[in-house]
A protein has these predicted regions:
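DPxDG-like acidic metal-binding loop motif
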Residues: 75-148
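An extended, acidic
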Residues: 155-271
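Acidic active-site catalytic centers that drive phospho-/nucleotidyl reactions
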Residues: 41, 45, 64-65, 85-88, ...
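N-terminal subdomain of lithium-sensitive/metallo-dependent phosphomonoesterases centered on the IMPase/IPPase/PAP
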Residues: 1-87, 111-114, 245, 259-260, ...
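Residue-level signal for inorganic ion chemistry
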Residues: 18, 41, 52, 90, ...
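Solvent-exposed alpha-helices and their adjacent loops that cap or buttress functional pockets
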Residues: 29, 73-76, 120-121, 140, ...
Length: 271
């Protein structure tokens, strides 16, 4: 699939830029409470957008840092939409923790009934790429073609009970208090809980069997789009936290190997 191969190349180039620029030092800015952005985020996004536009000038782009991409006329006219996070895990990056990545997803649109924030889309994810430059791990998938890590096919774990599983979550800047009772409930249910600080990698780690379940609130489409497809192609399940069909713009997500999914939903329903 050419568009997937192009996305893989673009993700690697962005990852190389992140490593190169990180060695030069950088200024940290705040987008909001506990929400950081660096010049490296912006440089990575600028490169990704430039490369996409050079290859696919008629495609639309939804990107984390560049607000103008949300209002392009091409959004309504484009058949394909690229959903990109140029540096997922910025706080880790800013503190020298090597758990961060580039996330790129490609959405094939059928119809759009959009508000100014484009909070409703009809279509399907056709490709997803997540590249972790510090570990040189490239996760990717295309619809109905399986999921891969550095060229090797991956699948979710076979853990059947949360008591035997390793779960993971995150605390977005605006949803910390909301997640506390869920964290407490899962802490009692799980073998252990981790908090990595990169939603895209949390999802990919489920896809390759490192984690068994994941939930988080208050996310954006660029946080989860690529990872959601990669999990599904690896045999896992992705919904919202109530077990309903995932809405990329719905902010809340529950993902698992599929075997512990119902148990996690039931745990959440008791909160």
């Amino acid at each position: 699939m050419k568009i997937l191969e192009d996305a893989k190349i673009i993700a690697r180039k962005a990852g190389e830029l992140i490593i190169r620029e990180s060695d030069k030092g950088f200024k940290i800015e705040k987008k909001g409470i506990n929400n950081l952005v660096t010049r490296v985020d912006k440089a990575s996004e600028k490169l990704i957008i430039k490369l996409i536009k050079a290859l696919y000038p008629k495609h639309a782009i939804i990107a984390e840092e560049s607000e103008e991409t949300h209002t392009k006329k091409t959004f309504k006219e484009a058949k394909y939409i690229w959903i990109i996070d140029p540096l997922d895990g910025t706080t880790n990056f800013a503190h020298g923790v090597p758990i961060y990545c580039v996330s790129i997803a490609i959405f094939k649109k059928s119809t759009a009934q959009s508000t100014k924030n484009y909070d409703y889309l009809s279509g399907e994810l056709v490709a997803g790429v997540v590249y972790a430059p510090r570990t040189d791990e490239l996760f990717y998938a295309s619809a109905k073609k399986g999921a891969y890590l550095n060229g090797k096919k991956i699948k979710v774990s076979n853990v059947k009970k949360t008591a035997e599983g390793l779960t993971v979550t995150g605390f977005t800047a605006t949803q910390r208090e909301r997640n506390l009772p869920y964290f407490q409930a899962m802490l009692k249910k799980s073998q252990a809980i981790r908090r990595l600080g990169s939603a895209a990698l949390d999802l990919c780690y489920i896809a390759c069997g490192r984690f068994d379940g994941y939930w988080e609130f208050g996310l954006k489409p660029w946080d989860i789009a690529a990872g959601a497809l990669i999990i599904e192609e690896a045999g896992g399940t992705v919904t919202d936290t109530n077990g309903n069909l995932l809405d990329l713009f719905g902010a809340d997500i529950l993902a698992s190997n599929g075997k512990v999914h119902t148990e996690m939903i039931r745990t959440f329903q008791k909160i």
